[in-house]
Regions:
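Low-complexity intrinsically disordered segments
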Residues: 34-117
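Short acidic-glycine loop/turn motifs at beta-strand connectors
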Residues: 10-14, 85-87
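Residues that act as N-cap/strand-start positions at coil-to-secondary-structure junctions
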Residues: 1-3, 75
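Extracellular/luminal recognition modules and glycoprotein regions
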Residues: 3, 26-33
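Short, solvent-exposed aromatic-acidic interface loops
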Residues: 17-29
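Short beta-strand scaffold segments in enzyme catalytic cores
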Residues: 4-9
């Protein structure tokens, strides 16, 4: 089972996917927190990707639960934010990878509030 989610960060022509197996419902808040913390790195996809992943994993020391990859998973349970550091925007894709037509700036997304358990 699980509560699977991914965050994608554009890297050149490709993407890096950050994966959470158990915390899908909390991923958007963690992304917003990472954008607030990493505001000085919004234009640097390497540093911002690391900051986001660090916020996702927290102090987790397990060998499972989180991952980094080059592909979208087929069993994701939440829409996928796709970050573009060049334009500092987030495009959204549904769980199948199709664009939803929603676009947000990093600034707008980072000030949203999210319900948490």
């Amino acid at each position: 089972m699980g509560d699977r989610a991914q965050i994608a960060v554009k890297q050149g022509e490709g993407r890096i996917y950050l994966y959470s197996h158990w915390d899908g419902a909390g991923v958007y808040k963690k992304l917003a927190d990472a954008l607030v913390f990493g505001k000085s790195r919004w234009s640097d996809e390497e540093y911002l990707t690391r900051i986001i992943f660090q916020k996702m994993t927290g102090d987790n020391k397990d060998t499972t639960g989180y991952g980094i990859g080059l592909n979208r998973h087929n069993d994701i349970e939440h829409d996928i934010p796709v970050l573009d550091c060049d334009s500092q925007t987030i495009d959204w894709e549904d769980r199948s990878g199709s664009p939803t037509g929603t676009k947000q700036s990093f600034a707008d997304f980072s000030v949203q509030t999210f319900e948490t358990d």
